[in-house]
């Protein structure tokens, strides 16, 4: 019995740590795009924010010479709530909330599926192997995250409320 409780707490801490890592990587991905003008995939960041950033980077091409805040500001308005959502989910998962852990798992599963679709598009377009390495590592990293979140959702306490 004591070993099971210890495993549950460790799984919840691991899942919360993973969500904190995803939130940090997502924020760094977004800031890197707008500060340096290029995408740097930190393997565990969310695809949702990368797609949002890509739209606003594309919009930054016209007019030329637009200030940084003019292009990055709207994208960060979308990215910041997503990062805050990840932080709230991490806190709730650390308290071993079953439904929140399940929601986190499914949210990350959808994100992994989006990365799989992007990877499949690269493969079908006959991209060079060097270009496929980083998306492949991203899928591996997301699979590890899914495993951690799945374990936390299985061993979390069952609560009636979503909060």
Model-found features: residue ranges?
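Topology signature of small-to-medium multi-pass alpha-helical membrane proteins
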Residues: 1-163
């Amino acid at each position: 019995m004591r070993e099971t409780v210890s495993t549950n707490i460790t799984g919840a801490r691991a899942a919360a740590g993973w969500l904190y890592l995803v939130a940090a990587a997502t924020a760094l991905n977004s800031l890197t795009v707008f500060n340096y003008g290029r995408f740097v995939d930190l393997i565990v960041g969310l695809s949702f924010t990368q797609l949002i950033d890509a739209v606003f980077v594309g919009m930054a091409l016209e007019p030329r010479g637009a200030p940084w805040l003019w292009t990055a500001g709207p994208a960060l308005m979308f990215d910041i709530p997503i990062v805050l959502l990840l932080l709230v989910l991490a806190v709730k998962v650390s308290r071993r909330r079953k439904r929140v852990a399940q929601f986190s798992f499914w949210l990350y599963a959808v994100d992994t599926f989006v990365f799989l679709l992007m990877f499949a598009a690269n493969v079908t377009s006959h991209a060079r192997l060097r270009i496929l390495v980083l998306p492949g590592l991203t899928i591996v990293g997301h699979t590890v995250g899914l495993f951690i979140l799945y374990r936390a959702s299985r061993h979390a306490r069952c609560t009636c409320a979503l909060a």
